[in-house]
Amino acid sequence: AFCLLFHQGKRYCLDATYRYLPPEDIPQGIQGRKALVENGDSCLILTLPQQDASASTDSLNYHYRLMTDSNPPTLKGTATRVSTGEYKEYLLSLYHDTPKEKQTDLLNNQINNTAAVQSADGEYCLEADPHEDFFHQPIDTTRRKQDYLLPWRCRIVREVTIDIPQGYAVSYLPADFHIETNQGILSCSYRAGAGYIHFRKVMEIRRKRIPLALIPAW
């Protein structure tokens, strides 16, 4: 059960099962469904609106510097995260469910990423994609017999800027990529500037359910 509050011409959805979801947002599990609302001696039947995928956004920005003088070479820098909607509720729940002595580790934005750097003969291969999102969860396409359901509709943005030391030049960047299906979109872009590389990835899940026949393409 949940509560609908009407205040100053606006409607707020209060659901105690989502401790950290702002009242302006509606849990995706009940979006688009009909609700019976008490209205004095009568009642109202309302259809709860369905919000866009962008209402639940997770944006993660990394700013690195390639450290060629460390052993092993590494990407060192900081991370900044901004989340909204159900994604924000998920992260806040994760934080508060973590033992207090470990909560500080979750808030640490200092990154030292050695796994993203491979070197040989004075050349460096950098992996800009952080690879942590729904799109990288493995799905067994050979034995699965049912549709696959993603956690929620959302928009995920990953941006990575890597500062390159003087004396080095970018010799290769992957081609940009964009694909769009009924379930969502995935796009990646790379560009090089004066002394830096910039990577941007946008993933938008518009429909949570992936039909069994479409799983191999996904």
Task: Kindly label every feature range from the protein language model.
Residues 1-218:
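A sensor for short, sequence-defined functional sites
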